[in-house]
UniProtKB/Swiss-Prot annotation:
Its EC number is 3.6.1.27. It comes from Pelagibacter ubique (strain HTCC1062). Keywords: Antibiotic resistance, Cell inner membrane, Cell membrane, Cell shape, Cell wall biogenesis/degradation, Hydrolase, Membrane, Peptidoglycan synthesis, Transmembrane, Transmembrane helix. The chain crosses the membrane at residues 5-25, 41-61, 74-94, 100-120, 135-155, 180-200, 208-228, 234-254. It is found in: Cell inner membrane. PANTHER family: UNDECAPRENYL-DIPHOSPHATASE. InterPro entries: UppP (IPR003824). GO terms for biological process: cell wall organization; peptidoglycan biosynthetic process; regulation of cell shape; response to antibiotic. It is a multi-pass membrane protein. It catalyses: di-trans,octa-cis-undecaprenyl diphosphate + H2O = di-trans,octa-cis-undecaprenyl phosphate + phosphate + H(+). Catalyzes the dephosphorylation of undecaprenyl diphosphate (UPP). Confers resistance to bacitracin. This is Undecaprenyl-diphosphatase.
Length: 256
């Protein structure tokens, strides 16, 4: 029991911190599970980890989400931008392709490195477009298509959507805001698919589910708050450097 609680605490903290930073939550969860040899295969725990993050981002942007009732254009843009990841996620989940990508340290190492470099290149330019006057259907669709790459562990959903938004000349804060708003349907869709697969599982671990939702919520919420404050003042270089360090460590583990 105690080991299960420790495992859930670690996974919840990792999920909460890494979900909304451009460092890939799926990669970090895979790495932690492999290194610490966690053996929990409960899909309900996976659902609860994502549910905590989903509740956090919804709570943080609650005013913006309520304002969507009076901003039909932004609502339509978010729907358009979410269609690609919803379709791709369903296809990959239903065909079993997701199993080929999970727990593959080589894939994680290479994607962490490559997409970290791409993030650096996209963030170098001093663009200053704002969502309010420059986000259109074509742009959000392209960003949504980029988001499909996040299905590969190590790419990072936040990282690739921020990268795409920066490539379309949005400033760092608005690029991050686009990323976080697109995260809501993406995480919700992933949770629905996981919940569908979890139907029929035993619910003996309800207390672990409660712990994982609570911790994931708290760490996700404060990570979003920290990141948006940080991105107003600094570049994304620290996350690029972090990704490079992680990829080097993974390459050492793999090839030694």
């Amino acid at each position: 029991m105690f080991s299960n609680i420790i495992e859930i605490i670690i996974l919840s903290i990792v999920q909460g911190i890494s979900e909304f930073l451009p460092i890939s939550s799926s990669a970090h969860l895979n790495i932690v599970e492999i290194i610490f040899e966690f053996n929990s295969n409960s899909l309900m725990i996976d659902v609860s980890l994502h549910l905590g993050s989903l509740l956090a981002i919804v709570f943080y942007f609650r005013r913006e989400l309520l304002d969507l009732r009076n901003n039909q254009k932004l609502l339509s843009l978010l729907i358009i931008g979410s269609i690609p990841i919803v379709i791709a996620g369903y296809v990959i989940s239903s065909t079993g392709l997701v199993n080929l990508l999970e727990n593959n340290l080589k894939i994680i190492a290479w994607t962490t490195l490559i997409f970290g470099i791409i993030l650096y290149l996209a963030d170098k330019s001093k663009f200053d477009k704002k969502i309010s006057s420059n986000l259109n259907f074509k742009t959000i669709l392209y960003i949504g298509l980029f988001q499909i790459l996040a299905l590969i562990p190590g790419v990072s959903r936040a990282g690739i959507t921020i990268t795409a938004a920066r490539l379309f000349r949005f400033n760092r804060f608005d690029s991050s805001k686009i990323s976080f708003l697109l995260a809501i349907p993406a995480i919700a869709g992933a949770s629905v698919l996981q919940l569908k697969n979890a139907i029929g599982q035993s619910f003996e671990l309800n207390y672990l589910v409660l712990i994982s939702i609570t911790l994931s919520f708290l760490f996700s919420y404060f990570t979003v708050k920290f990141f948006l404050d940080y991105i107003n003042k600094f570049s994304l270089n620290v996350f690029v450097i972090y990704r490079i360090i992680i990829s080097i460590i993974l390459f050492i583990i793999i090839y030694n």
